Amino acid sequence: MKKIQFFDTTLRDGEQTPGVNFDVKEKIQIALQLEKLGIDVIEAGFPISSPGDFECVKAIAKAIKHCSVTGLARCVEGDIDRAEEALKDAVSPQIHIFLATSDVHMEYKLKMSRAEVLASIKHHISYARQKFEVVQFSPEDATRSDRAFLIEAVQTAIDAGATVINIPDTVGYTNPTEFGQLFQDLRREIKQFDDIIFASHCHDDLGMATANALAAIENGARRVEGTINGIGERAGNTALEEVAVALHIRKDFYQAETNIVLNQFKNSSDLISRLSGMPVPRNKAVIGGNAYAHESGIHQDGVLKNPDTYEIITPALVGVDKNSLPLGKLSGKHAFQTRMEEMGYNLSEQELKDAFKRFKQLADAKKEVTEDDLHALILGQSSESADDFELKHLQVQYVTGGVQGAIVRIAERDGTLIEDAATGSGSIEAIYNTINRLMKQNIELTNYHIQAITAGQDAQAEVHVVIKDKSGAEFHGIGIDFDVLTASAKAYLQASAKSKTGSKQADFEEVK
C-alpha cells in the first residue's frame, strides 16, 4: 500500500485569500494544530516577501518538532538564502522553489526564453541543494505549459538535485482526465520518476481541485498540497480534509495510507475558520454543518434503522463529537486545560491563567458554555492581546433627524488614552467614523458579518469585518462581546490596527 504525504499551505497560499491575514501568534497556533493533525510538511510562508513573514517562518520552524517545515522561494539566490536563514532551527527543513513554464507566463511575466528558464532552474536548484536536503521544484502554471517543455523543465530540475516535483494547476484549468494523463506522461518520460516524490497543487476555479488531486494520486503522485477548508486565492485550493477522508473511505480503490489523524479535522477546521473569518459553508463536504444532517423522511428512517444506509462517514471519524462533557462555572482549571488541548489550543501558563479567568467570567454570565463559546473566548483573547489598540469606552446616542453619535475611547499600547466623537446614519457608521478619526485613516469597509456564537438570549455576538486601505490591501478583524455594538467596534479596531502595522505580506509572484 502506497504512502501519501500531506503538504499544507494554509499559512502561505491560504493567507493569499483576500482579507485573510494571520499574525505570528495565530500562525504558530495553526501550525501546532496542523502538527497534531499529522500533516507531513507545513509551508510556513514566503521568507523573502517581508520582515513579518520571515519572522513567522522562523518562529514556526522553531516551534514545530514532529514534521517538516518549508518556505517558498523564487529562482533567486537571495530568496534561497533568506529561506535557509528562516528555517535554520527547523527539525526537518525543506525549501519550495518555483518558476513558471507556460508560454504566457514566460513571455509576459518573466520575459524569459525557454533556454533562460531552463538555465535558471538548473542553477538555482543546484544552489538550493547545497543548503537543503529536500528541495521541491514547482513549474508554475504547469497545466497550461507545453507538455514537451514541461517534461524538459522537470527533468532539468531533477538532474540539478530536486527531490520533490510539484505540479501546480495554478489557475484551476485542468480536469481529472487531463491531469491524470499528465502524470502518466511524466511517469513514462522521467527516468527517475519512482525515485522522486511527485506532488499536485490544485486550485478550485472550475470546482475540480479535490478530484484533480485524487486523479494525480491514482497516477503516481505521492504528495498532495492543499489547505484546510480549501481556503486560498480566488476559488481556493484543494481541501485537504476531503482528500484525506476520500483516501480513507475508499481505501479499497486508492490503496493508500497517510499520517493524518482524521479526528483532528473538526478542530483544525474550526480554528482556521475563526482566525480567517471565513465561515465553513453548511453544505461543505466532510466538515460542513449539514454534512451529517438528514432532512428526508425516508433518509431519516433509514439512518435510524442503520446509519450505513445513508452515512458513509461517521461524524466521530473527523472529530464531530456531540457528546463531549460540558463545562460550567464549577469546572476546574484542569478540566478547562484538557478541553483546550482537545480543541487544538496549546496555551502557555500565563495564557491558560488569563483564559481560565475569562472562562469563569463567561460561565457566570451564561447558563451553558458551549464549545463555540470556548473557541470565541480564546479567539477574543488572542486578538485583543495582539493589538496595539484596546477599546476602553464606547457610548452611542441619538442626535437628531435619524443621525446617531458615538464617543470612543481607545488605549494605545503604551497606555495613552485617546478619545473622539463622530456621527453617522446609524450606530455602526457613527462608531466606525469615530475610529477613523482616532486612527487618522481613510479606509473602506468591504465586508461586515455578524453571527450569534450560540443560540439563546445570552449568546455572544461575533463580528467579522474586512477593510481595504488606499493601496488596495485588505485586512480582517474579529470582535466578540455580549453587546453587538461593542463587538462591532472591537472588530473594526482590530482590522484598523492591522492596516496600521501592515501585517499583510508584500505582493510577490507566487505559486497560486
Swiss-Prot record:
Region (Regulatory domain): 390-512
Enzyme class: transferase
Catalytic activity annotation: 3-methyl-2-oxobutanoate + acetyl-CoA + H2O = (2S)-2-isopropylmalate + CoA + H(+)
Cofactor entry: Mn(2+)
One Gene Ontology CC term in the entry: cytoplasm
Quaternary structure note: Homodimer.
Record protein name field: 2-isopropylmalate synthase
Record organism: Listeria monocytogenes serotype 4a (strain HCC23)
